[in-house]
Amino acid sequence: MITLFQCLYLILFSFICYQGAAAFSHSTAASWLAAALGAAAAGLYIWNTKRVWKHCSSGLCAWIAVIQVMSVGVVLIGTDIMPVLCVIAIFAGCEGLRIGQSALQARLSDQIDKLTQAEQHANQMLIDVRSRNHDTMKHITAIKSAQPKADTQAYIQNWADQYSQYDRFLKGENAYVAGVLYDFLEKARASNVSVSLHMHTPLSSLPFSPADQVSLVGNILENALDSAAEAREKAEIKLETSLRSGLYVLTCENSTPGMDPKVLDTIYQSFGRSTKNGAHEGMGTYIIQKLVKGAFGRLDFTYRHPIFRLEIKIPFQK
């Protein structure tokens, strides 16, 4: 269905260019040349915005197509350039609406996915805690039956480490953020990525709704982990939170296999640029930037191979 709308868009824009050239030069050759250039421009636009089209609903595309078809009819009324300019303005407005709504829909879809994942991670964390409690009596029995004191101490230490492994990082976090952190730490351990957390202020204290907290934290940690896991050198992630002069400061550093300079020039500025290798849309970086901007915060990043450093400062009031 989306492909049909794209073809219609290409045909309509070519027709507008044809009519515009005809109004200017009254030459058939010039009109056909303008139509060809218009088709090429429309094709290039569709190619560059293909990630946005994928998130656009069929209903919105249908309404925009109706508006564009009706506006093209205006071109047939007159023979001067004014109707053509009006139609081009209508096309630009429709495409601005399409891109804005598609980006919003993609952001909401990502937020729903992140919340669903956070709930699953929180449930998994609860199951893990319950399973440890379930084995408590078995551990006590094993300690009672142990003979050498050294073995008993080592067993107790190992048992305590299992219980306290993530406790200090999850302290003070709400269930959703705790679920995101728990899943991140488990995936980092499975990927042999070293994690250093300095949580002077809970992530749950971020001045956002729980849904936006999950979106911000989840995307930051996911991007850092994906990049660090691909690093050829020492794979590590450092996350620090603190309060400074009325600002909530979140800093994340991660090793990376390298970044394209073209991506660095536009990262956190436009939809469709990703820090990851492969076919990624850059939706995570887009959402991070939108959330920080919406909270009147500031986002800065630096890249000195092999370390990518992200720093976010957001006004904070208790």
From Swiss-Prot:
The keyword Lipid biosynthesis does not apply. It is an enzyme of class 2 (transferase). Residues 132-318 form the Histidine kinase domain. It is found in: Cell membrane. The modification Phosphohistidine is found at residue 134. SUPFAM superfamilies: ATPase domain of HSP90 chaperone/DNA topoisomerase II/histidine kinase. The chain crosses the membrane at residues 4-24, 27-47, 72-82. GO terms for biological process: phosphorelay signal transduction system. It comes from the Bacteria. GO terms for molecular function: ATP binding; protein histidine kinase activity. Pfam families: HATPase_c. This is Sensor histidine kinase NatK.
